Amino acid sequence: ESRGLGDVYKRQPLFCFPTVASNCASVTAISVIYNPDGSFREYYYPKNANHTFIESSIIADSPEELLWAGIGDALSKECEAVFASKEDELSHTPMMGVQLSKICTTPLVEYGKKALDDLRANKVSYELEQVALDIIISTGLVSNMVSAAPKYYYNSSLAHCVYYGSTVTKGGEKHLHGEIVSLGVLCCLLYTSDA
């Protein structure tokens, strides 16, 4: 079982070498466990990496659809953290995470198109690096700061609910995580009247 493997990792240093910028998994301490049928089962919190090494030339050579999905997933960080925490009095760490979430959207909007264009050309650029760092590092740090279940959990709310719902629908597996989460972002923005 994956949790048993995670328990082994808790005792060892963990170094991550992401080859794509599709999510924050290499920085966050959150692991998602799925049922054999592909539906969401639970979150598991083994530990976060001691260090994450990112080589821009490897990211620039990765599949375009994974960067696109990473942008879609990262766009959820601000709207979900702000929405999920708005009724609570936040202590230092989750408050810092929510504030950090507010800077995750800007690089994606400002540099996202150029980053995708450069990735299509397998070109390392400032824009691609900024978007990759935002997807992998910034959102991962936010996830670690806003997720201390059962005390508080502001990491995934409405946008990710759309994704988790898709895991129990026929054909849901044909879509990338960030692709569906980006639809959830639109739902979250509409629900919170920020659209």
Question: Predicted regions span which residues?
Answer:
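Alpha-helical architecture
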Residues: 16, 53, 158-159, 194
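Active-site segments that bind and position negatively charged phosphate/pyrophosphate groups
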Residues: 90-193
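A glycine/threonine-rich phosphate-anchoring loop and its flanking beta-alpha core
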Residues: 10-101
